[in-house]
UniProtKB/Swiss-Prot annotation:
One of the protein's GO biological processes: positive regulation of melanin biosynthetic process
Name of protein: Thioester-containing protein 1 allele S3
Crosslink position(s): Isoglutamyl cysteine thioester (Cys-Gln): 859-862
Record organism: Anopheles gambiae
Keyword Zinc: no
Organism placement in taxonomy: Eukaryota, Metazoa, Ecdysozoa, Arthropoda, Hexapoda
Lineage top rank: taxon: Eukaryota
Length: 1338
């Protein structure tokens, strides 16, 4: 078969000057800190030697000299001379040239412009996965290389930035230090981040070096993959598409299930659909109805949904299938791009089927214009019709025509070459390319050669050259050693003079290896999950090695996250790339010529095609429960040992799948090494279990726990499968209550998934361990796994907490009584009582930082609860000189996540909004800006310009009177609604400006105008909420009326419990009281603030937070500020807890800051007494909880539910309608949320909401708890009906279902709510149990 494969681009530009028998060759490009080599050849028969002055010089655009180097050299007859120039490290951009002048009577002058290349380093990024879920950790490596693929000596650090899809800076490393050219770090993604494509960018000296993207989204990693391909290449004449559908688990075994196939033709309209049962592989034919094509090919779209049997897990694949008019295509391949008039021209028509195989037996008429060529030919076994054409001396163009008998037509023109000589030289490689081995080349010339020169070029420079003297031969065997300097790629150029014309040729050398010849292998290609695997590495002693392994299933999303051999080749080529021009070989080789009039350079010297050149390629037991199901692992760095090798033993995850393992190595001298392709290995067991468990169930429901058994041993076996009752959490339906396990037996044929299930009830709330073991052959082969499902209460849990605070400056003894307020209608057995002693005010806040509020946080304001408390905790820890570094690290890490979350709500004008891309909010922008400013003390990722822009936006919204009004929607009426002259919002914005040192100066006029407005309004403020924020603003400003405002605020307060507590009774009493406490701290009224603190701590949740975002923000801020003044450093006291007839003792000293708790309080206890004796500070907390049936709640919303008829037990469609019931005409709620919980066994897909009303649209939707709950957000609600339909699907079998519920409530006043229950099918145990599970009554 003929091969006409185009050679690759030469990555070194060379200039050649031939005059007086002198040939000068050198690189066209120069770089800083790199050698520049010039080669001068003397083939002058008259002069025994020539003397030359070489001058390399450069200057900037304004004439400043940046380089001036001269060298005197002499070159003897029939010899080469290599001259090296070392370019300085600090070489900068400029205009450079080299000049060669003859000396001592030798007349010669040539100069050439050189091109400065600034690119001296390149970068790569490796990420451990292509896609991440919220809450995942992103591991990444940055690799920086110089032009020789080594760590650059001058680059010690880089600037790394990670941005979210809106280009907000989420994390940055300003000075990321490189080790062996590598920087490695990670990013913890927040639980509710902005979904989409994120970006990692790397900068050096202010210029971007490299960037890479990864995706953040909700996804489920499929256990199997589906491939859809045409069974035969579809042609128009077939009028059908025949498809092969293959479904295999990632560990290679076939999947059984149903494939739903849909065909879409023109305009993306559904043409037809079919279903077929598939076990591993299936075929289906989709016939067209008069399908006509307008072109030679046309795409149709096929969508295949494959549903796995027993589990209903689904994989959807969409494919573009091309339908062709003809069964083949043709391409003209030529020995050279152009023909020479008067010389033979070889070419061929290559016929290929659309699958890439040669199309033989294609017959047609071949016509070539201008030469009178006409014949009928048939393609041979290689799909070729070979042609040897004889263009005449006067031929200008060849028009090659092919007409097949089936109507296929092809035409292409070939132009003549503008030539100066018929002579040419050819270089052919005649041996393999191997490191340190001899390479043999055949040099062939049409003229008898008296000399030729060869040049070896690599990495932008000439690394070797030679002057060869054949004895007037036309063929010569050139032998060169393949040195390490040539690796990974090089070029060999040969040149000679034939009759006053320089002719030349070249060959590419691609070693397919790197100087750092790193190798990685594993001891087994198939291994059991959870077992050890041995990795063997070899390379340069002491070299750095980076390893990574990930689940092959991730490649279904993307594979650009990893580093591959091809990436290294692209980096290398990127240093030396030149645009190829197939008609100008000088351009492609990077050559330009300088010569006298009587010596010319040939312009068409590519006589033959050449192959790409490549080198050869190197080559009675304990049962452990599978609990580690990672998607990526082995993200590890090691060093090669002194011997040049290293072994590593690692435990593989418990997942049954296929894995990709990759590795690279970096050595300071030999540079980068990487394995040729990822190592693929499989974790699979001869016998194993696959689970299909629900996310959650309700206590008391009968639930089918389903598993599938797989047997790969080639024969049928009886399997014993045991489900365990772990910690007495589980009841086996139809079995004795005392059973600790339940064993079933089932026959498992080979290579077929066999389902087995257990009918159970959950006895306890919380997390229930599901532990299952299966064995065959008397236990010779076993598998076991353990997972957790959540057990939810039948009713709504009602958590409560009573708190007393004490602060003894000297020794005291005091008793605190606690009477528990437990509803008489509480569910039996649901009561839990706990005592907790906190020697530190923020202990529980710190412990629960990542879970302060149980309510949804799906808008820009609520989301701040994941950000602000971390700032307050860090303020407190630093203010009190805490040495608890792990707490500081936890708060800082969560602060970063909260920042990520919040950046979702940044608007294009620099402000912040309550929803993504929904418009700006004055209130929220003030809230976020002041928080970001404070947070910047603890994380450098926050852009000061971003905070400044938000505050500038705020300042621009001030009214001429000094007042601020909300520009966006109102969802927090008291703050934003403009009620009572807008005092609350104006005060709030002023506090944001006053708490920012830059804004306080920049916007001093805005602040002054605002304070004037507040002081003018002070006499008319009668609302405690407004006054509390205004007073705090005046305190921050140091206003002359601050004392008057505080006195007025104190007059509005309420004292109770013998003046041990003080608070302000408004609809926002926690927020109001907290602002008042902040003013007390600013006024240094610490002792007077303690009664306020007493009341505030009594309002807290079990987690240490308050009911809502603003309560938590201001409440914790106030408590923190006072707590900083009341240090627990003097604690020394004893606490007695008395209940019924029992007593429990606790001793506290100044070194204890963690809480102590006691859980063993009987549930029928109604009263506790706690005695404290000693000196110090502490919180006494009695936490209790009970479940209350849903019918016992009062309603302030109208809520209606309608279960629609779907005709199927597997689909649930629930119509939900809600509206606010106002006390005053036309009044509205604050932000309203509707939460729909689903019955056990049902889950929603990604888009569950339809048929929503549009008068008051839904602003946001959250899917929670594994798809078992959906939350809808509204700005507010009035009397209008707000309706939507939610659709869910039954994925698991459940009997005795508890009712599910829908709740609607006002986020800022949760006393305004409504709850309704609903039920679905009332299946009993007998309807879902299998024979051996069924109780006697069935």
């Amino acid at each position: 078969m003929w091969q006409f494969i185009r050679s690759r681009i030469l990555t070194v530009i060379i200039f050649i000057g031939a005059a007086h028998g002198l040939l000068v060759v050198g690189p066209k490009f120069i770089r800083a800190n790199q050698e520049y080599t010039l080669v001068i050849s003397n083939f002058n028969s008259q002069l025994s030697k020539v003397d030359l002055l070489l001058k390399l010089e450069g200057e900037t655009d304004n004439g400043l000299s940046v380089l001036n180097v001269t060298k005197m050299v002499d070159v003897r007859r029939n010899m080469n001379r290599m001259i090296n120039f070392n370019m300085p490290e600090d070489l900068t951009a400029g205009n450079y040239k080299i000049t060669i002048d003859g000396q001592r009577g030798f007349s010669f002058h040539k100069e050439a412009e050189l091109v400065y290349l600034s690119k001296s380093i390149s970068g790569l990024i490796q990420v451990d996965k292509p896609v991440f879920k919220p809450g995942d950790t992103v591991n990444f490596r940055v690799i920086v290389l110089d032009t020789e693929l080594k760590p650059p000596a001058r680059v010690k650090s880089v600037h790394v930035t990670i941005r979210d899809p809106q280009r907000n800076v989420i994390r940055k490393w300003s000075t990321a230090k490189l080790y062996a050219g590598v920087f490695e770090s990670d990013l913890q993604i927040a639980p509710t981040p902005m979904l989409g494509v994120w970006n990692i960018s790397v900068e050096v000296e202010g210029e971007e070096l490299v960037s890479k993207t990864f995706e953040v989204k909700e996804y489920v990693l499929s256990t199997f993959d589906v491939q859809v391909m045409p069974s035969v290449i579809p042609l128009e004449e077939h009028q059908a598409v025949n498809l092969t559908i293959e479904a295999n688990y990632h560990f290679g075994k076939p999947v059984q299930g149903v494939a739903k196939v849909e065909l879409y033709l023109d305009d993306d309209k559904l043409n037809q659909k079919k279903e077929l049962t598939v076990y591993g592989k299936g075929q289906v034919e989709l016939r067209f109805d008069n399908f006509a094509m307008d072109a030679d090919q046309q795409d149709v779209r096929v969508k295949v949904s494959f549903i796995e049997q027993y589990t209903n897990r689904t994989v959807v694949k969409q494919s573009q299938i091309t339908v062709y008019r003809y069964a083949y295509r043709v391409e003209l391949i030529k020995e050279s791009p152009q023909f020479r008039p008067g010389l033979p021209f070889k070419c061929a028509l290559q016929f290929t089927h659309h699958d890439g195989t040669p199309a033989k037996g294609i017959t047609g008429k071949v016509e070539v214009s201008d030469v009178g060529f006409e014949t009928t030919k048939t393609s041979d076994n290689d799909g070729l019709i070979k042609l040897e054409l004889q263009p005449s001396e006067g031929s200008e163009q060849l028009g090659i025509n092919f007409n097949a008998v089936d109507g296929f037509f092809f035409y292409e023109d070939v132009n003549k070459v503008e030539t100066v000589t018929d002579a040419y030289i050819k270089l052919e490689l005649k041996s393999p390319i191997k490191r340190n081995k001899l390479m043999r080349f055949m040099v062939t010339c049409t003229e008898r050669m008296t000399f030729f020169v060869y040049y070896v070029m690599s990495k932008g420079n000439i690394i070797d050259a030679g002057f060869m003297r054949p004895n007037k031969q036309t063929k010569y065997l050139l032998q060169l050693n393949a040195t390490e300097k040539m690796i990974p790629k090089a070029k060999i150029l040969i040149a000679t003079v034939a009759g006053r014309t320089v002719v030349y040729d070249y060959a590419d050398l691609d070693f397919q290896e790197l100087r750092n010849n790193f190798d990685l292998s594993i001891d087994e290609q198939e291994i059991k999950p959870g077992r050890q695997i041995e990795l063997s590495m070899s390379g340069r002693p002491g070299a750095y090695v980076g390893l990574a392994a990930y689940d092959k299933a991730l490649l279904l999303f993307n594979k650009n996250h990893d580093l591959f051999w091809e990436d290294i080749g692209q980096v290398f080529d990127g240093f030396h790339a030149i645009n190829e021009n197939e008609f100008d070989i000088f351009h492609s080789l990077g050559l330009f010529a300088r010569t006298l009039d009587d010596i010319l350079f040939d312009s068409a010297n590519e006589k033959t095609g050449r192959n790409a050149l490549q080198s050869g390629k190197p080559i009675g037991k304990l049962v452990s429960y599978r609990t580690n199901f990672q998607e990526s692992w082995l993200w590890k760095n090691v060093s090669i040992g002194r011997s040049g090798s290293r072994k590593l033993i690692e435990v593989v995850p418990d997942t049954t799948t296929s894995w990709y393992l990759t590795g690279f190595s970096i050595d300071p001298v030999y540079g980068l090494g990487i394995i040729k392709k990822p190592i693929q290995f499989t974790t699979v067991q001869p016998f194993y279990i696959v689970e299909n468990l629900p996310y959650s169930i309700k206590r008391g429901e009968a639930v089918v726990l389903q598993f599938t058994l797989f047997n790969n041993l080639g024969a049928e076996y009886i399997a014993d499968v045991t489900l365990y009752n772990v910690a007495n959490q589980t009841e086996f339906v139809g079995r004795p209550d005392t059973d600790l396990s339940y064993t079933k037996s089932v026959s498992v044929p080979p290579k077929v998934g066999v389902p087995i299930s257990f009918l159970i009830k959950a006895r306890k709330l919380g997390e229930m361990a599901v532990r299952v073991k299966a064995s065959i052959m008397l236990g010779h082969e076993t598998d076991a796994l353990e997972k957790v499902i959540r057990v939810m209460p039948e009713s709504l849990a009602q958590p409560k907490m009573d708190t007393s605070f004490f602060c003894f400056d000297d020794y005291k003894n005091q008793t605190f009584p606690f009477n528990l307020d437990i509803n008489k209608k509480a569910d039996n057995g649901s009561k839990k009582i706990e005592f907790r002693l906190n020697p530190n005010l923020l202990t529980m806040v710190i412990k629960n930082l990542d879970n302060l509020l149980a309510v949804p946080t799906g808008c820009g304001e609520q989301n701040m609860v994941k950000f602000v408390p971390n700032i307050l905790v860090l303020d407190y820890l630093y203010a009190t000189g805490s040495k608890e570094q792990h707490l500081i690290d936890k708060a800082t890490n969560l602060l970063r996540q909260g920042y990520q979350n919040q950046m979702r709500y940044r608007q294009t004008d620099g402000s912040f909004g309550v929803w993504e891309k929904s418009g700006s909010s004055v209130f929220l922008t003030a809230f976020v800006a002041t928080s970001m400013q404070t947070a910047s003390k603890y994380m450098n990722d926050i852009d000061a310009a971003m905070v400044e822009k938000a505050l500038d936006w705020l300042a621009s919204k001030q009214h001429s009177s000094g007042r601020f009004d909300e520009t966006g929607k109102v969802w927090h009426k008291d703050m934003q609604g403009g009620l009572r002259n807008g005092v609350a919002l104006t005060s709030y914005v002023l506090t944001a400006l006053l708490e920012n040192d830059i804004a306080k100066v920049k916007h001093a006029v805005v602040i002054q105008n605002g304070m004037n407005y507040l002081s003018n309004q002070l006499a008319f403020i009668n609302n405690a909420y407004d006054l509390s924020i205004a007073t705090y603003a005046m305190m921050l400003n140091g206003h002359t009326m601050k004392k008057e405002a505080l006195d007025k605020l104190i007059d509005m307060s309420i004292s109770d419990n013998n003046k041990k507590e003080r608070y302000w009774g408004t609809t926002n009493q926690i927020e109001t009281t907290a602002y008042a406490l902040l003013s007390f701290v600013m006024a240094e009224k610490y002792l007077d603030g303690i009664p306020i603190m007493n009341w505030l701590v009594n309002q807290r949740y079990v987690t240490g937070s308050f009911p809502r975002t603003q309560d938590t923000f201001v409440g914790l801020k106030a408590l923190t500020k006072l707590a900083e003044k009341i240090s627990p450093s003097r604690n020394d006291y004893t606490v007695q807890l008395k209940y019924k007839k029992s007593t429990k003792y606790f001793n506290i000293n100044s070194e204890q800051i963690d809480f102590q708790n006691f859980l063993e309080i009987p549930e029928d206890t109604k009263k506790l007494e706690i005695n404290v004796g000693g000196i110090g500070f502490g919180l006494l907390e009695v936490i209790y909880q009970f479940d209350l049936n849903l019918v016992n709640f009062e309603h302030r919303f109208k809520l209606d539910l309608e279960k629609q008829n779907t005709g199927s037990d597997y689909e649930l469609r629930l119509r939900v309608c809600a509206n606010y019931i106002p006390e005053l005409t036309d009044s509205q709620s604050n932000m309203a949320l509707i939460e729909v919980t689903l019955p056990s066994g049902y889950v929603v897909d990604r888009n569950p909401i339809s048929e929503q009303t549009t008068v008051n649209p839904i602003q946001n939707m959250e899917i929670r708890y594994g798809g078992t709950s959906v939350v809808l957000y509204y700005y507010n609600m009035g009397t209008e009906r707000n309706c939507f339909t939610v659709t869910a699907y039954r994925r698991f079998k459940v009997a005795l279902k508890r009712p599910a519920y829908v709740v609607v409530y006002d986020y800022y006043n949760t006393n305004l709510n409504a709850i309704k229950v609903y039920e679905v099918d009332k299946q009993n145990v007998c309807e879902i149990c299998e024979e051996e599970d069924c109780p006697a009554e069935c």
